[in-house]
Amino acid sequence: MKVVINASTVRIGGGLQATHSFLSECRVLSGNTFHVFLSAKMSALIDRSLYPGNFMFYNIKASSASMQGRRQLRRELSALERRIRPDVVFTIFGPPYWRPQARHICGFAKAQYLYKDSPFFKIITLKQSLLLKLKEHFHISSFKNDCDVLVVETEDVQKLLMQRLPGKPVHTVSNTCHQVFDDENKWSYTVKLPTSNAFTLLTVSACYIHKNLSIIPAVIEYLVKQYPGFAFRFVLTFNAQQLPGVTAMHLPYLHFTGKVDIADCPALYRQADAMFLPTLLECFSVSYAEAMKMDRMVLTSDLSFARNICRNAALYFDPLSSQSIGDAIYKAATDVQLKEQLLHNGRQRLHQFLSAKERAAAYLKIIEACHETGHEGSFYIQEKINING
């Protein structure tokens, strides 16, 4: 079977990591012929010398970042498809902005178009809201008209997306840690935090609006006032200039690492006490699984998407309340029994997620089913599966 893996739309964030993980596993899981379309950012992450002869890579010059770029992208991808004549196209994360002739499977991870009750919509400006609605129109149109089958990462998203796009087949394959977390020989120890006895909260993320990290200065102020003498620090994987509202008063409680590579992350978690994520919108943040994998507490927003993923393996707070967040942080740092319970629950919850290998196998099963049977139903793959059968 000839399969096009379309990663031309993957340019930022966790999509880069997930795509790299999937491609790495495909090297050993499948004998299909893979034609891989790469964005410039994705191409920089791929060591093509590691891939066998059934992989062919194409650097896609056009970008989906503008209307003109999307027109060029459609022409470029269509020309390649005519030459390759694939059986199936799998766009790892959409919207694809392109309708191939072959059967088309596409990943969906646009939480902002489904969780309309999110407090995210309370913190954005009118201009941002109008721009988001415009993007939503074009993005949903592409998912509806350019894709035959959609793939999401949680049951919650599957249910909401099937309501948004009735009649469209939607499959679910859970997100998971990159396979580098499974092999300590591949860990990098270049990012070393200053030695400290402070309770260390780690956030592995860019400073996107929906991550709600701008609340951190207010949380610092609350903790300093409410719990004098409590030693804590936030470790953030971006630059200090990107976090709004920071003054000299906040700096002793902040450490900025700058952008980190995936190989840096396991050792970075080892240097932290908890993973902190006050996010307002997610489909499935891989940070949850990473923290559980590294046996670290999860402190996150009390919102449905977070509870759907973490269940009883996280300490939840109101993400718009600095008091609620601060109290949760202090409780996590001082309640030893709570810590042990959360870590135990995290280890148990982690067993329910797929491994990187199982996730890739699940994607391949969907690709094969769509090619061989034209399967139109929807199903859910989250628990352990038989990757050989």
Positions of predicted regions on the chain:
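Conserved donor-binding/catalytic core segment of Leloir-type glycosyltransferases
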Residues: V4, K192-K211, P217-I220
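Nucleotide-activated donor-binding/catalytic signature segment of Leloir-type glycosyltransferases, i.e.
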Residues: F55-M56, P244-P266
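Short alpha-helical donor nucleotide-sugar binding micro-motif in glycosyltransferases
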Residues: L77, E81, A267-A272
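Membrane-proximal helix-turn-helix segments that form the acceptor-binding/catalytic region
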Residues: Q128-L150
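Aromatic "clamp/platform" in nucleotide-sugar-dependent glycosyltransferases that forms part
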Residues: L280
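Short hydrophobic beta-strand element within catalytic cores of glycosyltransferases
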Residues: K293-T300
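Conserved acidic donor-binding segment of nucleotide-sugar-dependent glycosyltransferases
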Residues: T300, L315-Q323, K331-V336
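A charged, aromatic-enriched C-terminal amphipathic alpha-helix characteristic of glycosyltransferases
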Residues: Q337-F379
